[in-house]
Each structure stands twice: as C-alpha cells, then as structure tokens.
Amino acid sequence: MDIPFILGAYASHPTPELEADYYQLLADQPWVSGVEIPYPGQLVTQADVLAAHLAPHWDFNTITAIPGTMQHVWKDATFGLASPDEEGRQAALAFTRALCDDLDDLCDKAGRLLVGRVQLHSAPTRLADAEAFKRSLEEVVGWDWSGATLVVEHCDKYIPEQKPEKGFLSLESEIDIVAEVGIGIHLNWGRSAVEGRDAETAYQHVLEAGVRGVLDGVVFSGAGPEETQYGYAWIDGHLPAQADEPTSLMDAEQIGRCAQAALAGGAEYLGAKVCVPKDASLAKRLAMLEGIYRACHLQG
C-alpha cells in the first residue's frame, strides 16, 4: 500500500560525525517518505544542516513541538495551548508562532515545501483545559504553515493516581476538539500504552480516533513495565520493538494489528521512532526501524 512512512530519526541519531551518513542511509531506503523533526532542536540551532539532511525525494516530513513544549512546562507549570491561565496560554501561542516562522525559514533555505504535518499538544500537565485548547487551535489553524497541516498528538492523559509522563487532555476531549476545528489526531503507540499501562490502550485509541473520522497518523514507539537502558518503567522514552528490547510491549503482532486498524480508520501516514543502544551501528539502527515497517505489512 502506498502510504507515507516517516521515521523519528532524531531518537536514533548516532554521534554527530556520523549523522550525515545516517541520513544518507535512510534516504537510500525506498520505504522512507520523510522524518519527524523535533522542535526546537536543529530547526533552530542548525537549520542549514537540517535542510541538507532532508533528501530531495522526502515529501512527507513532520515536525513535533513536544520537546520545546515540555522544556517550557518544566519551567512554568501553566505553559501550554490548553492552559486555563491566560499568560501561560499566550506564552504557548508565542512559542507556536516561533515554530511557524522557523518552518517558513527552513523551507526558504531548502527552496521547497518540506513538511506535511506539524504536531501540537494539549499542555500543560494536570491543568489542561479543553476550552482553552480549542481557542488556541482555532487561532493557530489560520496561520500560514508553509504547506503543512496541523495535527494534535495525543500524549498520556492526566490520571490522578498515576505519575504522569505528560498528563495532558484525554483522547476523547482531543477528538471532540479537533473534530470541531477541522484537523486530525496523531497517535504514538508508546504514549497511549504508557497512559493505559498496557498494549490494548494503544489499539483502542487507534479504533476510537478512526471511528470518529479524525485519525491522521500513527507512529510506533515502544513502552514497557520494566526499567531498561532507555529509562525507568513506563517511561515515554521510545523503546524499541520487542524484537530488540524484550521488555517492550510493542511486538510484531501489536504493530501489525494497529497499523491495519489505522489504515482501516483512514490514517494518512504511519511511522516509527525508537531509541537504540548507544553503540549500535548505522546498519543496526536502520534494521530496528525497518523491522517496525515490515511488521506493518504495507508491502505488496
């Protein structure tokens, strides 16, 4: 099936001196349609380098605002597009405007439109308010996004008795909001699994967004109940698939059923984003990502 497949390559970056070789290796793979770009990251600090890494035939790159969003939330608990605190919401709108402007600059440097989707989030932790988020999205959706479409990436919802990784709005609330605003939902398998503490939650989230007609994309990152080299139990840390990390709940069967459910639910793209052992070769990094792609059963 001809559907874009993106890679969160930044999670599996090698050392800086091997970065260009890694991107070239990814560009040589016919099944790779683009990469997920973390914001701010290289988009702010090394836009020229980033533009050079993006292969000319990659026509479906994405940007995620989650790194910068969380950096702000850790400093200011009221920061977020869903903040009930107006100063916190305005600060998040200013951050989002900067992202929009930096995307425009990146496209100028590359001489073409580069990005298909921009992922926004319903921060802040614990305090997120649905009406505030809706107001923010209604404003930003009208901006010029250099050819990109906005999506809301669901992260684990706030559950009082559970230590949050992100602790944002529920998927149900986000679905209602994006349906009104006219944009879609982006799911990350691991973030949904972290919320429910099981693999089934990820599958149910795919079904829920699909049934409501707002599922836009699904990216596969793992999660699990044990401490690993990638972090503590239930970290939102992009664990590899079970074939490469035995404690990960994301096995080939889970990937396959969620990918097929996503396609049936109208998803426009799929992807993979996993961390890797620090000493992994470039070939091993690629193999870990390609294993997820193969498990989606998109070929033929």
Predicted regions: what they are:
Residues A20-W31, V44-G68, D101-L113, V140-S146, ...:
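Acidic (Asp/Glu)-rich catalytic clusters
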Residues T201-G210, A241-G266:
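A short, acidic, amphipathic alpha-helical segment used as a generic capping/interface helix at domain edges
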Residues D2-A11, V32-E36, F60-T62, V115-Q119, ...:
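Structural preference for beta-strand elements that scaffold enzyme active sites
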Residues A77-G182, K284-C296:
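Active-site acidic/histidine proton-transfer and metal-coordination neighborhood
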Residues M1-A98, N188, Q299:
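N-terminal pre-domain/capping segments
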Residues A11-E19, E36-L50, R126-D129, Y158-F168, ...:
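Acidic-and-aromatic substrate-binding clefts and catalytic sites of carbohydrate-active enzymes
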Residues V140-Y232:
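Acidic/histidine-rich catalytic cores of soluble enzymes
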